[in-house]
UniProtKB/Swiss-Prot annotation:
<dbReference type="GO" id="GO:0005814">
    <property type="term" value="C:centriole"/>
</dbReference>
<keyword id="KW-0966">Cell projection</keyword>
<dbReference type="GO" id="GO:0061824">
    <property type="term" value="P:cytosolic ciliogenesis"/>
</dbReference>
<feature type="binding site">
    <location>
        <position position="84"/>
    </location>
    <ligand>
        <name>Mg(2+)</name>
    </ligand>
</feature>
<feature type="binding site">
    <location>
        <position position="63"/>
    </location>
    <ligand>
        <name>GTP</name>
    </ligand>
</feature>
<comment type="function">
    <text>The small GTPases Rab are key regulators of intracellular membrane trafficking, from the formation of transport vesicles to their fusion with membranes. Rabs cycle between an inactive GDP-bound form and an active GTP-bound form that is able to recruit to membranes different sets of downstream effectors directly responsible for vesicle formation, movement, tethering and fusion. RAB34 transports protein involved in the redistribution of lysosomes to the peri-Golgi region. Plays a role in the maturation of phagosomes that engulf pathogens, such as S.aureus and M.tuberculosis.</text>
</comment>
<feature type="short sequence motif" description="Switch 1">
    <location>
        <begin position="71"/>
        <end position="89"/>
    </location>
</feature>
<keyword id="KW-0460">Magnesium</keyword>
<feature type="binding site">
    <location>
        <position position="81"/>
    </location>
    <ligand>
        <name>GTP</name>
    </ligand>
</feature>
<feature type="short sequence motif" description="Switch 2">
    <location>
        <begin position="108"/>
        <end position="127"/>
    </location>
</feature>
<feature type="binding site">
    <location>
        <position position="62"/>
    </location>
    <ligand>
        <name>GTP</name>
    </ligand>
</feature>
<keyword id="KW-0333">Golgi apparatus</keyword>
<feature type="modified residue" description="Phosphoserine">
    <location>
        <position position="244"/>
    </location>
</feature>
<dbReference type="GO" id="GO:0060271">
    <property type="term" value="P:cilium assembly"/>
</dbReference>
<feature type="modified residue" description="Phosphoserine">
    <location>
        <position position="241"/>
    </location>
</feature>
<keyword id="KW-0653">Protein transport</keyword>
<keyword id="KW-0007">Acetylation</keyword>
Length: 259
């Protein structure tokens, strides 16, 4: 029985969404990894379509984490929002290259007194979104500690990182240029992809979350292919012979499009 909501028409991805700035991107390919495209075409994505991928959103109080999520999930902006207590989450369903894919977006509290509660929900994240206010230099500096706290509960080598500057609508062009320079430096140090958004106007919000969904999906499919490949390599059949014991690795012939 399928208990997940159907995929909305505006959540269908047939192409790889592009990064905002090539100077700070997880990768700059124009298309999905060839192995991912091939696996989707041949329906070899394993359990990816049944999994729910966890994405946590962290950052200082009032940087706009909740507004960012609400703008994408509900297409709303509430100027009189209340600070998140502990954690909250939204579920978003996508279809990527014909495969269903779900993201669970965890909105965590930025207040110090709720930090210990929120941190218990960090574990198992496949992507971490660190949000700062483009008009507040201190909030950018604090992103380093937020990331460090989140990585205590996750494997740094297997999680995707995104550094997101919010409230772009409040920055003058000159102010933004200066802040972006610092933000790109921080993103490079973190090995994170940089984005700048406005939850008020909606600028870059949709594009950003589509990028998160696409890259998380891509990572999931590649991991699934790696696991299935390991299982085939490990499937060893022992053959008895008069002269010696021979070992033959039983493996299926790979499709021509997948190296």
């Amino acid at each position: 029985m399928n208990i997940l909501a159907p995929v909305r028409r505006d959540r269908v991805l047939a192409e790889l969404p592009q990064c905002l700035r090539k100077e700070a991107a997880l990768h700059v390919r124009k298309d999905f990894h060839p192995r991912v495209t091939c696996a989707c075409q041949e329906h070899r994505t394993g359990t990816v379509g049944f999994k729910i991928s966890k994405v946590i959103v962290v950052g200082d109080l009032s940087v706009g984490k909740t507004c960012l999520i609400n703008r994408f999930c509900k297409d709303t902006f509430d100027k009189n929002y209340k600070a998140t207590i502990g954690v909250d989450f939204e579920m978003e369903r996508f279809e990527v290259l014909g495969v269903p894919f779900s993201l669970q977006l965890w909105d965590t509290a930025g207040q110090e007194r709720f930090k210990c509660i929120a941190s218990t929900y960090y574990r198992g994240a496949q992507a971490i979104i660190i949000v700062f206010n483009l008009n507040d230099v201190a909030s950018l500096e604090h992103t380093k500690q937020w990331l460090a706290d989140a990585l205590k509960e996750n494997d740094p080598s297997s999680v995707l990182l995104f550094l997101v500057g919010s409230k772009k609508d409040l920055s003058t062009p000159a102010q933004y240029v200066l802040m972006e320079k610092d933000a790109l430096k921080v993103a490079h140090e973190m090995k994170a992809e940089y984005w700048a958004v406005s939850s008020l106007t909606g600028e870059n919000v949709r594009e950003f979350f589509f990028r998160v969904a696409a890259l998380t999906f891509e990572a999931n499919v590649l991991a699934e292919l790696e696991k299935s490949g390991s299982r085939r390599i490990g499937d060893v059949v022992r053959l008895n012979s008069d002269d010696s014991n021979l070992y033959l690795t039983a493996s299926k012939k790979k499709p021509a499009c997948c190296p």
